[in-house]
A protein has these predicted regions:
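Catalytic phosphate/metal-binding cores of nucleic-acid and nucleotide-processing enzymes, i.e., regions
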Residues: 1-77
Length: 77
């Protein structure tokens, strides 16, 4: 069975990590559905983390994409 997600903290979260040297990165509905399906089946919070680098591997910025229900949980703590 294929396990989706590059990083998994059992029972907490499942993270799909992406890296690009470009100034933009497209997140597709398919990407969201795959990580969300895998995370929810394990009772975990899904996330996609995108790292932007300078082309030589040096990190310039990093952002996490999470569902709005997860953001709501974080904001109401």
């Amino acid at each position: 069975r294929e396990v989706k997600g590059d990083v998994r903290i059992h029972g907490v979260c499942r993270i799909e990590c992406k890296t690009t040297k470009h100034k933009s990165f497209s997140v597709t509905l398919d990407m969201i559905r795959k990580i969300e399906e895998a995370a929810i089946s394990g009772g975990e919070m899904p996330a996609i983390v995108v790292e932007f680098n300078n082309g030589a591997g040096k990190k310039v910025a990093e952002v996490a994409i999470i569902p709005t229900y997860a953001l709501d949980q974080l904001c109401t703590r």
